[in-house]
Amino acid sequence: MKFTLISSCIAIAALAVAVDAAPGEKKISIPLAKNPNYKPSAKNAIQKAIAKYNKHKINTSTGGIVPDAGVGTVPMTDYGNDVEYYGQVTIGTPGKKFNLDFDTGSSDLWIASTLCTNCGSRQTKYDPKQSSTYQADGRTWSISYGDGSSASGILAKDNVNLGGLLIKGQTIELAKREAASFANGPNDGLLGLGFDTITTVRGVKTPMDNLISQGLISRPIFGVYLGKASNGGGGEYIFGGYDSTKFKGSLTTVPIDNSRGWWGITVDRATVGTSTVASSFDGILDTGTTLLILPNNVAASVARAYGASDNGDGTYTISCDTSRFKPLVFSINGASFQVSPDSLVFEEYQGQCIAGFGYGNFDFAIIGDTFLKNNYVVFNQGVPEVQIAPVAQ
């Protein structure tokens, strides 16, 4: 779900891609571009993550371009120096382009619409009267968060073009009202990549479900690479395949617990240098969360290892000098994956720095972009499982 409150947009630029897939397989590649503007807020990111997961009341104890038909590229934006990643999706006939936040931590596709009484003036709005493939549904939807942000409206169906592959009759949620945090944000809605058991309206199929059932991709997978602003930004989503040029070494297969509708994994151990700072804990891979949000005890141990001080709001103040930091390393299913020292600092303000990790009073971790921009992930909805490898720098 959307956790970043941002208020300006930039132009979207196309990037070249390289995709791995078996011959004849269908896939979509969605690269990402960078926006250098916007001042991030770690506190906002923490609060929005808390709101997102509280509403579900969780209780836990060698590549190259493959010349296939069906390959499509949609530019995306790394907004606010790794605060949020969103991409352009075309909806309706004739098609209208919408900037959507791609989010593995939720499962709804919702957009601003002309039915909306308070949507942002700069948001692109879907108009049912202007699409010949619009189908009325009539059911209502509503999403509310613990921080007071919300969106609500009605369901409809229309064609959705995702990177050049046309999903027919995709259920979309048309916003009739939305909170200011959405209205003033950089995007026009959200595209959820979680499992369909957590759609706001039960029984609705996700875009990934329909890509599979309509035969638009040959494998039920998507690869995610999120670029770092410090390295020029960029990144890509690839549906039906993955890009082996974006990671180094081999992919490690990790089982997924999707019983709650999320991409749940187990982290076996966390270390800093030679010191183990945490033993086994559960986590959710969530591209829609900016930071690495840890269980309170794990966050406290990590903070001690880096000499960070608790700000009392889920964030930590940390040294701005990352040259003396060692990476934070997660051991997952027998392999090691790093959060690099530069990712341990999220924002700097008046000579003080806020850490790229925090806590939210959960007994599980929300493994957001702080981790994911350091590691390539292939999400496999069919098994389910993920495959992870360190990004190629």
UniProtKB/Swiss-Prot annotation:
Lineage: superkingdom: Eukaryota
Maturation-removed propeptide residues: 22-68
Family indicated by similarity: Belongs to the peptidase A1 family.
GO molecular function, one term: aspartic-type endopeptidase activity
Start and end residues of each Peptidase A1 domain: 85-389
Top enzyme class: hydrolase
EC number(s) stated in the UniProt entry for this protein: 3.4.23.21
CDD domains: Aspergillopepsin_like
Keyword Protein transport found: no
Enzymatic reactions: Hydrolysis of proteins with broad specificity similar to that of pepsin A, preferring hydrophobic residues at P1 and P1'. Clots milk and activates trypsinogen. Does not cleave 4-Gln-|-His-5, but does cleave 10-His-|-Leu-11 and 12-Val-|-Glu-13 in B chain of insulin
Annotated source species: Rhizopus chinensis (Bread mold)
InterPro entries, per the entry: Aspartic_peptidase_A1, Aspartic_peptidase_AS, Aspergillopepsin-like_cat_dom, PEPTIDASE_A1, Peptidase_aspartic_dom_sf
Name this protein carries in UniProt: Rhizopuspepsin
Annotated catalytic residues: 103, 286
Record-level GO BP terms: proteolysis
Signal peptide residue numbers: 1-21
Keyword annotations: Aspartyl protease, Disulfide bond, Hydrolase, Protease, Signal, Zymogen
Entry keyword Cell inner membrane: no
Cystine residue pairs: 116-119, 320-353
